[in-house]
A protein has these predicted regions:
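Extreme N-terminal, non-catalytic leader segments
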Residues: 1-34, 229
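Loop/turn-to-beta-strand initiation segments
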Residues: 60, 108-111, 140-146
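Internal gly/pro-rich beta-alpha loop/helix module
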Residues: 146-210, 214-217
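Long, charged amphipathic helices and adjacent flexible linkers at domain junctions
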Residues: 208-216, 220-260, 297-301
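Substrate-engagement module of ASCE P-loop NTPases
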Residues: 129-149
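Conserved P-loop
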Residues: 28-100, 106
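Conserved ATPase-coupling elements of RecA-like P-loop NTPase cores
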Residues: 116-131, 155-158
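Small/aliphatic-rich secondary-structure junction motif
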Residues: 250-301
Length: 301
């Protein structure tokens, strides 16, 4: 009885939350997050390319802030869109530049690009965090494109620290990701990212060399990539569950994914089974473990 009541309550909460979001939608901007496992995967370029496509279709686009980090490809894309002047601030005797929220609200484009969602603003700005600036833009009816790395997601920062041993100073609440209208995963393989580092396309040579041996070790990147993929899969699954609940017809929303893991005498079999089970849970998919017996005795070693 308890489980049934609890399930009904959860279903009601989901429907109510959806209704509230729909009621709040008129006049509110849309948020799209370009999400990746680490710096250098191409989030800013993907955001700029999507914005250029929107501008070509007649959307009034402006860059609020886009960080090139000296990367030529990024700078070329930035040059193809109008850009809002940065706001100059003096902090502890040093002149710094920040996103000018007030000017963005005055200009009020249809779409604005605000890079590095987890950024902490200089003291004296309207908000302490950039994601709070984004909230004001959305409330004003402006669509926003932004970027985020997995290590900056609040609930995963400890996990990332355990993986990389690198402290995470800036985080974004999970609610920001949960309420985003669209998340685009920007994904490359760990080997491709390490190649970009060696070619100087992410950091300068001395910094890149140190990064390859620490944060950007292949094992770290593989774990971060799995984490990013899992987060996006979980969000898609939650959205699908919500739609199925509201529709009242679960049968037409079956995604069809099934997972199979092949196991054998390898010492890694247990780890493979655990990984498959986690992925099946994230995808809400059935899974099986398969072992093939060829009838041939295994060698002594």
């Amino acid at each position: 009885m308890f489980s049934e009541t609890h399930s009904d309550s959860q279903r009601a909460d989901r429907i109510l939350a959806s209704i509230r979001r729909e009621e709040a939608r008129p006049g509110r901007g849309l948020l799209k997050i370009f999400f990746g496992m680490a710096p250098g995967v191409g989030k800013t370029c993907a955001m700029l390319e999507a914005a250029i496509q929107a501008a070509d279709k007649g959307v009034r686009v402006i860059i609020g802030v886009a960080e090139s980090h000296g990367r030529e490809d990024t700078m070329r894309l930035i040059g193809r869109l109008p850009r809002l002047p940065m706001k100059k601030m003096v902090y502890r005797g040093v002149e710094m530049e920040e996103f000018d929220l007030e000017e963005a609200l005055r200009v009020k484009p249809q779409l604005i690009l605000v890079d590095e969602l987890a950024h902490t603003n200089v003291p004296g700005m309207r908000h302490r965090k950039r994601y709070q600036d984004v909230e004001d833009l959305l409330a004003a009816g402006i669509d926003v494109y932004t970027t985020l790395n997995v290590q900056h997601l609040e609930s995963r920062s400890d996990t990332v620290h355990d993986i990389t041993a690198a402290p995470v100073q800036e985080t974004v609440p999970d609610s920001v990701l949960a309420e985003a209208d669209c998340i685009q995963l920007v994904d490359i393989t760990p080997d491709q990212l390490r190649t970009r580092l060696r070619e100087g396309k992410v950091y300068s040579a001395p910094q890149a060399s140190a990064a390859l041996d620490h944060f950007f070790k292949e094992s770290n990147l593989t774990a971060l990539r799995e984490l990013a993929l899992r987060i996006v899969a979980e969000k898609v699954d939650h959205e699908l569950t919500e739609v199925r609940t509201i529709s009242g017809d679960r049968s037409i929303w079956r995604s069809g994914e099934r997972l199979m893991v092949a196991v054998g005498p390898s010492p890694f079999s247990a780890r493979l089974v655990r990984w498959t089970r986690r992925m099946a849970y994230a995808l809400n998919a059935p899974w099986i473990a398969l072992s093939v017996d060829t009838g041939v005795p295994l060698p002594p070693e």
